Amino acid sequence: MKSILDETIELSSDLISINSVNPTFGGIGEKEKSIYIKNKLEEYNKNYSIKNCEITEYNTVDSEGIERPNIVSKYDFGKNDTLTIISHMDIVPEGDLGLWNSDPFKAEIKDGIIYGRGSEDNHKGIVSSFLLLKMIFEEKIDPKYNLNLIFVADEEDGSKYGLSYLVNNFEDEIFSSKDLIIVPDFGMPEGEFIEIAEKNILWLKFKITGKQCHGSVPENGINADLIAFSFGKGLYDKLYGKYDGINPIFNPAFSTFEPTILKNNIENINTIPGYVELNFDCRIIPKYDPKEVLSDIENYIEVFKNEIEKHILHFDISEKENISITYEILKLEKAEETKKDSEVVKKLGSAIKNVLNKESVLCGMGGGTVAAFLREKGYNTAVWGIGDETAHQPNEHIKIENLIKMAEVYLDILK
């Protein structure tokens, strides 16, 4: 059998070499990576003579006809409760290659660190899951819990074809209320932080219609850019002003309402645009209901339109009634919080103390993980890992020793 170090390097290197960029971002998806994972699971079953394993594929097809795979590997150790570890197979694009010091899809190892796209997000979950299996069967321990290893698609684009698909269609088949669920899709360098809460996520696309005209005669049209600028700033001020509560478990501790994408329908400098799209990324602390935020947005749209003269100096007043501001909800994920005294939080905290010699710290975050879907269904879920916070960045990387430490923490829970 390979050493734990050699196994870690091989698994990480193999996964980095398989491009599984989410199709929404122009990639080919997770199929090839899922084949590798399933074959590796079967290889482990053979090498360690594992008889109590059931591997099930829950594949679906997305709107573009691309197969989106999900794998659930169950290990029955004859126990009443189950430790469930959920990792995702899709990755984000590599971005500007000029910012990388190496090929993002060819692992590079330097000073005990492995570099490559996906190395942290979320290969650390996949690799540490396999290392856990290696430890269980080489050390021949009798685990206190059954074990479920779940590998899902589509996390980077909202999980419609991944965990959301599993929870909405196969919940009773896969999950139990007694499960200890860990999502290794977060992590700080020392590994002491356990994420138990996420902010509500609300992504909006505003569609703003004015009237296109020549740039030299603004009074013949309605400048949709100006509407977008003024509307965006006004909405920004209104939402930050009203939803100003603080929850210190998060960093930042407040809700955020940030305009992001702004684009119009013209390419030449001497045309006033008649149509603009403006996107907002809202991360709302759990005390506030996103439905209330949406209601305030709808009210603000009407107020803004009625006061349009305050925002544009020169425009075709006869077309005022044709000004349109509508919105599309791109994502709405309502957040629930894992109980601080839940079994998974207590067991994970104890394992962190035993293995890492760190006192665990409970926290929340503004980013989203698949834990949101489970918490919404009432499952206490801990998001945890060890990493250097390089996800989605050029030169993404992770320390090889931290992949092994993650598996040791899981193992401590099972002992």
Curated annotation (Swiss-Prot):
Cofactor note: Binds 2 Zn(2+) or Co(2+) ions per subunit.
Keywords per UniProt: Cobalt, Hydrolase, Metal-binding, Zinc
Enzyme Commission number(s) of this protein: 3.-.-.-
Active site, UniProt feature: D90, E155
S-S pairs: none
Superkingdom field: Archaea
Binding site for Zn(2+) 2: D121, E156, H392
Cofactor: Zn(2+); Co(2+)
InterPro entries (UniProt xref): ArgE/DapE (IPR010182), Bact_exopeptidase_dim_dom (IPR036264), Peptidase_M20 (IPR002933), Peptidase_M20_dimer (IPR011650), Peptidase_M20A (IPR050072)
Residues that coordinate or bind Zn(2+) 1: H88, D121, D185
Annotated Pfam families: M20_dimer, Peptidase_M20
GO terms of molecular function: hydrolase activity; metal ion binding
Top enzyme category: hydrolase
Gene3D superfamilies per record: 3.30.70.360, Zn peptidases (3.40.630.10)
Family: Belongs to the peptidase M20A family.
Name this protein carries in UniProt: Uncharacterized metallohydrolase MMP1398
Originating organism: Methanococcus maripaludis (strain DSM 14266 / JCM 13030 / NBRC 101832 / S2 / LL)
